Curated annotation (Swiss-Prot):
Protein name as it appears in the record: Importin-13
Source organism: Gallus gallus
Keyword Manganese: no
Keywords: Cytoplasm, Nucleus, Protein transport, Repeat, Transport
GO cellular component terms attached to this protein's record: cytoplasm; nucleus
Chain positions of HEAT repeats: 19-49, 51-83, 90-130, 137-174, 189-226, 231-263, 271-320, 325-367, 370-433, 435-471, 482-517, 519-553, 557-595, 598-643, 671-711, 715-749, 756-798, 810-840, 855-888, 892-926
GO biological process terms on file: protein import into nucleus
Main localisation: cytoplasm
Subcellular location as annotated: Cytoplasm; Nucleus
Keyword Membrane: no
């Protein structure tokens, strides 16, 4: 069709005529100018709710109009009905209903999208009229379309009726009817199924019904069952859907219908009907086997969905039918077949993953019975779960190396996730099978490794180890009598493959807590781990395992420390591992060194970090460029990760079992502090060249921040130097990481008299520099503002005396906080709210704070109400509520005046709230000085009113 020339935007005052609506629609669809499109859309929305909408809608549906115009025509019918939240005039219902029936009949053989749109409009109207104005809506629809009409083909009318009946429940599910009306309408619709289901049954059973009609019937049934219709009323159609599974054209739609029908939560009430469904499900087994043999993944997938839907949703109800235990066990075995379906997931099959949650559900239901009944079910189902373990471990096996080499990276990732799901299932199954499961795995592994006549594949060995690892990672195996044997077997494994080696490493890591209780066995596995460190393909598994061993067994590692450090140094120097693994390795070494004597720690630290210090000295002399920047960040990262875990005071110890092994607290300076003091000047030199680079500054701050967190009071000797350096850094180029480190220092040391002077000086300097930044315009630095607000809150919490300093401009800080409340970044606003909730309670005890709040509190209230009125994200309302609560609690006499004055402004905080609503909110806030939760509820309620969202479905869960 030829496009018309670009039309100008329709003026806002233009009459709502057919011609003007057509022009606006043409502009909306074809105008390349986005502003014109937006204007057209805005005008069309006004047209939809205008009185003339009823008139032009029908004219736009003329057959000579293009589909885009016809498609938009029914819009006023849906936008004006109560089902979507507004109202229509009762005297227009009959006319509207009649017109919609007429046009649906006309379009029955025409454009599918226009027909669907008209059906949605009639469905929306029906929902708004039920039950009072149109009590038998569905029966009337069926009757109207079954009436003879010589102008319209019978099949076309049938399809139109089925489309209407399909969209009606769908429209109900998405409607914004009030909750009480929704219940009413659902009940009416459920009763109306008596007019629908016989028709659907008749169409499915007719021999001459074409496939496309039957498919539409199944879709319609699938839509209706989601209205919580009693399962026994669906019985005939479910059986018909089972029959349709034999027709390849209807298979997918029939699966959807059966699954939707038996998955309804209410279905478990109809146990007799559920029992009747087991035979037809079991009857699908031959079709399932044929599909598996022929590689028909779609059919096997669909049949599995049906079996799992019945088993998973109703296992408790079916288990309760003791006299039918054999039929349910047959269903369980059918699902077991689906779990163990031949082929490798996801390349040869995608079905087995559907079944995993069923095994969780069945186990939960069995274990929820009282002990006597549970014992009976355990007797039946324990063998099933042992079989499940074998099936899962078989499914977890890697394919041959050759086959795996052809897999795409996406397929490998899906297989990895699938194995994680299997691992989670095995961990869960342990609750049912207990120690016997570990014994079974150990026996199988032992036979596998000692059978010289029949050498096993590495895949089989790896899968059994993977089963062990899955359980040992989350279950306390310290009292298992098979773990010593397993530790003894591990060195006998012939590792010829990366996947197997990875699993060996992860299994050792999973047993690290057991090794801590049985240190004599460490030497059995540690050499394997150290050897694996040198293999880049085993990077993640070997490094994470060494880290676990060093963390859990550190008090038993001194005899091996020299070897561990030497091997680690070697792989670090060779740059075998990626950055993140290098960081983990340094953390491992930190744990290891923590258990040594101070002299030993210093000696090892010297040999470990000297090469990096030398490299850093060299880099500090070079002209800054991207490559040496990465090297600097890497070295600083290594140091900060080492210092994160190197803790001779044992702050990180929380295991009772290690209490007896703890070394006495060391006297003298902490080794980390010794090293930091030695490299301090070098770090300052690096900073001098890289001060304008946020990443380098962040890396420097990270060294000290992690050290402070780990060492706590032991860091004290460094405080004066660090405060001075931070002051120089922040004065030159303000950065958030420097404020964050300042906050840490305030948190740990500000309350100690000896350290108060340098921290006070640093706090005042950071405050002064940041205030200057605010004067210049802080909008480009939300991260700095965020960190600064957190620093102020921390200072008020830990050392409020800082706000008594004569050269601290409390008024300026207050106004910075108010300005920060208006930032678009939610974390910044949250931090600002945190500042005020700490500041306001100090009004009475800190005179400068009290004076500033009393003189400027109205500005704060104004900003808070603006946020509540719609300027801030709804997710922040709890934080604004806390400020209002604090104002009311600590400045009540002022707040009562401020809130009255603020609310008297027209349109404030929103034009959507009336003076009465504002007055109610004000009084509610002023009355509540005890219950903070109640204030939060008030604020949430008021913000919805301000945004025009109150009472809508959109905010039902808010």
């Amino acid at each position: 069709m030829e496009r018309r020339a670009e039309a100008p935007p329709p003026p806002q005052g233009l009459d709502f005529t057919v011609e003007n609506v057509e022009k606006a629609l043409h502009q909306l669809y074809y105008d390349p100018n986005i502003e014109n499109k937006n204007l057209a859309q805005k005008w069309l929305m006004q047209a939809q709710v205008s009185p003339q909408a009823w008139h032009f809608s029908w004219l736009l549906l003329n057959m000579d109009k293009v589909p885009e115009i016809q498609y938009s025509a029914p819009a006023p019918c849906t936008s004006r009905s109560p089902a979507t939240g507004t109202t229509s005039l009762p005297d227009q219902y009959e006319s509207l209903k009649s017109q919609l029936f007429t046009h649906i009949t006309r379009f029955a053989g025409g454009s599918k999208i226009v027909l669907t749109r008209l059906c949605v409009a009639l469905a929306s109207l029906a929902l708004s009229m039920m039950p009072e104005a149109w009590p038998c809506a569905v029966a009337d629809m069926v009757r109207m379309f079954q009436a003879e009409d010589s102008n319209v083909d019978g099949r076309a009318r049938c399809l139109a009726l089925l489309e209407l009946l399909t969209v009606l429940p769908e429209e109900f599910q998405t409607s914004r009817l009030p909750q009480y009306r929704k219940g009413q309408v659902r009940s009416v619709l459920a009763q109306e199924c008596g007019s629908v289901f016989p028709l659907l049954e008749q169409l499915l059973q007719q021999q001459d019904s074409p496939g496309f009609i039957k498919q539409k019937v199944l879709k319609c049934f699938s839509s209706w069952v989601q209205l919580e219709i009693p399962l026994m009323d669906c019985e005939n159609l479910i059986q018909a859907a089972f029959t349709s599974l034999q027709d390849p054209e209807l298979f997918d739609t029939a699966v959807e219908a059966v699954v939707n029908a038996i998955s309804q939560p209410d279905a478990q009430r109809y146990v007799n009907t559920l029992l009747k469904l087991i035979p037809p499900v079991l009857g699908l087994q031959e079709q399932l086997r044929q599909a598996v043999q022929s590689g028909d993944m779609e059919t096997s997938h669909g049949i599995c969905r049906i079996a799992v839907a019945l088993g998973e949703n109703h296992s408790r109800a079916l288990l309760d039918q003791v006299e039918h235990w054999q039929s349910f066990l047959a269903l369980v075995n059918m699902i077991m077949f689906c779990t163990g379906i031949p082929g490798h997931y996801p390349v040869n099959e995608t079905t087995s993953s559907l079944t995993l949650t069923f095994w969780y559900t069945l186990q939960d239901d069995i274990l929820s019975f009282e002990p006597d009944k549970q014992a009976v079910y355990q007797q039946v189902y324990r063998p099933v779960y042992f079989q499940l373990v074998d099936v899962l471990l078989h499914k977890a096996q890697f394919p041959s190396d050759e086959e795996y080499g052809f897999w795409s990276s996406d397929e490998k990732e899906q297989f990895r996730i699938y194995r994680v799901d299997i691992s989670d299932t095995l961990m869960y199954v342990y609750e049912m099978l207990g120690a016997e499961l570990l014994s079974s795995l150990y026996d199988k592994l032992g036979r596998l490794l000692t059978n010289t006549e029949q050498p096993s594949t590495w895949q089989h060995t790896e899968a059994l180890l993977y089963g062990f690892q899955s359980i040992a990672e989350t279950i306390d195996v310290n009292y298992s009598d098979v773990v010593p044997g397993l530790i003894g077997l591990i060195p006998r494994i012939s590792i010829s493959n990366v996947q197997l080696a990875d699993t060996v490493m992860f299994t050792i890591g999973a047993l690290s807590e057991w090794l801590a209780d049985h240190p004599v066995m460490i030497n059995n596995v540690l050499p394997l781990v150290l050897q694996a460190l040198g293999n880049p393909e085993l990077s993640i598994s070997s490094v994470s395992t060494l880290k676990k061993i060093c963390r859990e067994c550190k008090y038993d590692l001194p005899p091996y420390a020299a070897n561990i450090v030497a091997v680690s140094q070697e792989v670090l120097m060779k740059q075998i591992h990626k950055t993140s693994q290098c960081m983990w390795l340094m953390q491992a070494l930190g744990f290891l060194l923590s258990a040594l004597q101070v002299e030993e720690i210093l000696k090892n630290l010297h040999s470990l970090i000297t090469p990096y210090i030398q490299q850093l000295e060299k880099l500090a002399d070079e002209t800054p460029n991207p490559s040496n920047k990465l090297a600097i960040i890497h070295i600083l990262g290594l140091l900060s990760n080492l210092f994160t875990t190197l803790d001779i005071s044992h702050h990180d110890d929380d295991h009772e079992s290690t209490e007896v092994k703890k070394l006495p607290v060391q006297q003298g300076p902490n080794p980390v502090v010794v090293v930091l003091q030695q490299v301090f000047q070098l770090i300052q030199k690096v900073l001098s060249k890289w001060l304008n680079d946020a990443q380098v500054v962040e890396s420097v701050c990270a060294i000290f921040e992690k050290s402070v967190k780990t060492l706590l009071d032991d860091f004290a000797p460094m405080v004066p130097q660090l405060c001075e350096m931070l002051g120089q850094m922040y004065s030159t180029i303000p950065q958030a990481s420097a404020i964050d480190l300042t906050r840490q220092l305030v948190h740990i040391f500000a309350h100690e008299p000896a350290h108060f002077p340098p921290i006070k000086a640093l706090f005042l300097l950071v405050t002064s520099v940041t205030l200057t930044l605010f004067q210049q315009g802080p909008r480009d630095h939300p991260d700095i503002v965020d960190s600064f607000m957190q620093l102020l809150a921390q200072a008020l919490k830990r050392k409020p005396d800082l706000f008594l300093c004569s050269n601290l401009d409390v008024k300026a800080l207050f106004h910075c906080g108010v300005l920060s409340l208006k930032f678009p970044e939610a974390p910044t606003v949250k931090a600002s709210c945190g500042f005020f909730t700490e500041l306001l309670p100090r009004c009475g005890e800190i005179a400068p704070v009290g004076q500033v709040v009393h003189e400027n509190g109205k500005v704060l209230l104004q900003a808070v109400l603006e946020g509540v009125g719609g300027q801030a994200s709804r997710s922040l309302m709890d934080h604004f509520a806390e400020i209002l609560f604090a104002l009311n609690k600590h400045c009540f006499s002022y707040l009562s005046i401020w809130i009255k004055e603020a609310m008297q402004q027209d349109g404030f905080p929103s034009a959507r709230v009336s003076p009465e609503q504002k007055e109610t909110f004000s009084q509610q806030i002023l009355r509540e000085r005890v219950n903070k939760r109640r204030v939060k509820e008030m604020v949430k309620e008021f913000t919805l009113l301000c945004r025009g969202l109150h009472g809508t479905e959109y905010t039902a869960d808010y």
